[in-house]
């Protein structure tokens, strides 16, 4: 289906309204959670995009958001507008743009911490503190487990990768061994 609407326009409109209402920071966590739910749960995403589910039912869900937090009224109206105009396929993209705008204003960087094993909260706090000092921004850390790392960790922040793990070390050694001009093969 061809969509003539612009996700940037929707995101900017929501951002400007929240800024005007001074609700940018008070709604950030809720909207981020909603975005993550849509991104990770295909059933929820399909609900908003389904032509078989009526507008009233979708609008009811948007209204329920306001029950949790009165500052989300503009966001609920934003959802209803997208749904009413049959632009729900733009929802993820518009929210992604909106979140980037808000994170820029609030000086927030998102980081992924990928490790071979679960990392305790104390260590996460230390990592966040070090990253906040390095980047001079508030860090939102999301953790993932990747057994292929064997031990150690990898932190991804935008295009930056900080890694200390066995998998990366083994790949470097392998590349040296296989490289004809490398140190080991002369």
Curated annotation (Swiss-Prot):
Localization per record: Cell membrane
A family per Pfam: OSCP
Major location category of this protein: membrane
Membrane-crossing residue ranges in chain numbering: none
CC annotations in GO: plasma membrane; proton-transporting ATP synthase complex
A GO MF term: proton-transporting ATP synthase activity, rotational mechanism
Membrane-topology annotation of the record: Peripheral membrane protein
Function noted in UniProt: F(1)F(0) ATP synthase produces ATP from ADP in the presence of a proton or sodium gradient. F-type ATPases consist of two structural domains, F(1) containing the extramembraneous catalytic core and F(0) containing the membrane proton channel, linked together by a central stalk and a peripheral stalk. During catalysis, ATP synthesis in the catalytic domain of F(1) is coupled via a rotary mechanism of the central stalk subunits to proton translocation. This protein is part of the stalk that links CF(0) to CF(1). It either transmits conformational changes from CF(0) to CF(1) or is implicated in proton conduction.
Subunit structure of this chain's protein: F-type ATPases have 2 components, F(1) - the catalytic core - and F(0) - the membrane proton channel. F(1) has five subunits: alpha(3), beta(3), gamma(1), delta(1), epsilon(1). F(0) has three main subunits: a(1), b(2) and c(10-14). The alpha and beta chains form an alternating ring which encloses part of the gamma chain. F(1) is attached to F(0) by a central stalk formed by the gamma and epsilon chains, while a peripheral stalk is formed by the delta and b chains.
Cell membrane found in the keyword field: yes
Chloroplast found in the keyword field: no
Highest taxon, organism lineage: Bacteria
InterPro entries with a match to the protein in the record: ATP_synth_OSCP/delta_N_sf, ATPase_OSCP/dsu
Listed Gene3D superfamilies: N-terminal domain of the delta subunit of the F1F0-ATP synthase
Protein name: ATP synthase subunit delta
Keywords noted in UniProt: ATP synthesis, Cell membrane, CF(1), Hydrogen ion transport, Ion transport, Membrane, Transport
HAMAP family: ATP_synth_delta_bact
Family note: Belongs to the ATPase delta chain family.
Annotated source species: Mycoplasmopsis agalactiae (strain NCTC 10123 / CIP 59.7 / PG2) (Mycoplasma agalactiae)
NCBIfam families in the record: ATP_synt_delta
């Amino acid at each position: 289906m061809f969509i003539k609407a612009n996700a940037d326009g929707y995101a900017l409109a929501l951002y400007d309204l929240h800024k005007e209402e001074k609700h940018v920071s008070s709604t950030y966590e809720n909207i981020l959670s909603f975005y993550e739910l849509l991104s990770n749960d295909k059933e929820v995403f399909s609900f908003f995009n389904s032509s078989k589910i009526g507008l009233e039912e979708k609008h009811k869900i948007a209204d329920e958001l306001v029950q949790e937090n009165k500052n989300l009224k503009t966001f609920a109206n934003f959802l209803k507008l997208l749904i009413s105009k049959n632009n729900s396929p733009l929802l993820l993209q518009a929210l992604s743009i909106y979140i980037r705008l808000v994170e820029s204003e609030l000086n927030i960087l998102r980081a992924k911490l990928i490790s071979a094993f679960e990392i305790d909260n104390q260590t996460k706090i230390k990592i966040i503190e070090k990253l906040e000092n390095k980047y001079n921004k508030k860090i939102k850390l999301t953790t993932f487990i990747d057994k292929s790392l064997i031990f150690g960790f990898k932190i991804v922040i935008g295009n930056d990768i900080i890694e200390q793990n066995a998998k990366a070390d083994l790949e470097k050694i392998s590349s040296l061994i296989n490289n004809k001009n490398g140190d080991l093969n002369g």
